[in-house]
């Protein structure tokens, strides 16, 4: 990219080289990590703007620094656009990450030791949903729910049973590796019956929700958190949506509760991404993500891979690689060597450790952003099958050639040299 040569290379060749190498990796490998995506040039430019220079503690119209009149415009644009996008009453666009957004809701509504019901990490949940190694699991009494051992889907009757037994202050829904639709309306019924608050972390599916391809949690949840990247295709960051009655508590939890100055250049990039998501073409893009995931999942199944829960309703799938005599760790390494990037991932009731795993997680947002279609998904499935079924140099060479051909056919940032 020109800016690397023009601005970074003369000042810091070591950093310039690392950025250039990462650019090459993104261009010439197939990105299938479900939580990653490629932002637009407009989002990238906004994040690299002069707004990175501005401190703006507080909120629009109520800052602790002068000179905030223009960053106020940017933050207001981000808030109003995302409220329109999801039909929310209140939005806080300042969280630096999804983890910060989740922590802020806990900080606003819970006291240390309060009971919370959240999805088991090994069944597809997230670290911030009560993992004992995360602050959420250290500060609060999380009770885990998971998926049925046979269907590998959430059993809402079991969730109800746990909720009525433990009477949690908060029920958390959402996942980082769950390939099926989540019934937020049903979970709100359970929360009401248990006299619990209800929070949805829609980080992975926010883009699908915005496009109307997944049930919108906003009408059902007291709080909705998300990242702004992944399927939403914005910059890396977080977001909280809530009902107006909780607005002050949420805003205070972010600032001055757990953060200081907001990252105004990132908020500008969020505003641009929300603007993009409001356009009709974003809906078509999300439809392609889901269609690509379905075809990729079905094609892998045809080639002998077991797909957790039997398929996917969204942008991701979990693939059990034991049928190929491999662990998830081994499969991730083999695929990376041929230019396909995935991540090892536990599958429900996994006998292997989280650092080894029996599965890999695959997602289609990034390849869809490159313009890849269902035919390309079939080619990707073939390359994955060859690489993992023939873990030798001959198989690797075939897979590399297929990856190279796909990357050439669907270039990343083609007009950016």
Curated annotation (Swiss-Prot):
Enzyme Commission number: 2.1.2.1
- Record-listed (6S)-5,6,7,8-tetrahydrofolate binding positions: 121, 125-127, 245
Biological processes per GO annotation: glycine biosynthetic process from serine; tetrahydrofolate interconversion
The family database entries (InterPro entries) matched by this protein are listed as: PyrdxlP-dep_Trfase (IPR015424), PyrdxlP-dep_Trfase_major (IPR015421), PyrdxlP-dep_Trfase_small (IPR015422), Ser_HO-MeTrfase (IPR001085), Ser_HO-MeTrfase-like (IPR049943), Ser_HO-MeTrfase_PLP_BS (IPR019798), SHMT-like_dom (IPR039429)
GO cellular component term, pick one:
cytosol
* GO terms assigned for molecular function: glycine hydroxymethyltransferase activity; pyridoxal phosphate binding
Q: What is this protein called?
A: Serine hydroxymethyltransferase
